Design a protein with these regions (language model features):
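Secretory targeting signatures
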Residues: 1-34, 71
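Contiguous segments within soluble domain cores/interaction surfaces
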Residues: 32-187
Length: 187
């Protein structure tokens, strides 16, 4: 074999082996989670384990009632919230998308207040500020981000997808988003 051909074979082998290793260690594969009443499993990002902490008040959501969601990601080793989190939230019911947007908090705890509007509007309005760096909604100091409009206005099961896209610094984008899927029941 010529020296040039040997280099091509070695390079190709390296690419194939690297692709296989990366395929087995994809953060999104480890972070995929289903939530059916119990917390989703921790996601592995490098040497860290991040746990989703999502709390809802009231815990039993009723149609057309308001609900406050508090969403944070806990670093298990430090037992503290991960700072500068950005995530995309997608809410759907029966395969129909209801809300999809990005949310951010510098301290790592996003509070979302859902208020159903009485009336005929089929869209939502979001009360908060746009963060220039992350292009995501952030809260006014001391207040939650408010989402007005029909979101949880029908009884049944809702799918909430969360794709974590930044951690630790507003400029630190994850190579692949960490995905969580949660089922929420509305009565």
């Amino acid at each position: 074999m010529t020296k040039c051909r040997m280099s091509v074979v070695v390079f190709t082998s390296f690419l194939l082996l690297g692709g296989i290793v990366v395929g087995f260690y994809s953060p999104s594969q480890e972070a995929m989670a289903q939530h059916h009443g119990a917390p989703p499993p921790a996601a592995a990002i490098e040497d860290r384990k991040l746990t989703l902490d999502m709390q809802m008040k009231p815990t039993n959501i009723t149609q057309s009632g308001g609900v406050l969601m508090t969403i944070a990601f806990l670093d298990e080793e430090k037992n503290a919230n991960v700072q500068h989190v950005t995530f995309r939230m997608d809410i759907s019911k029966d395969g129909k998308h209801i809300l999809s947007d990005f949310f951010h908090d510098h301290n790592g705890e996003v509070k979302l207040m859902f208020k159903d509007n009485e009336g005929d509007s089929s869209s939502q309005t979001i009360g908060g500020n746009q963060d220039v760096l992350t292009n995501a909604w952030i809260a006014d100091p001391g207040s939650p981000i408010t989402i007005r409009g029909p979101v949880f206005n029908q009884s049944g099961n809702y799918d909430i997808g969360l794709d974590l896209t930044t951690i630790d610094n507003d400029k630190t984008d994850l190579i692949e988003p960490v995905e969580y899927h949660l089922d929420v029941k509305v009565s």
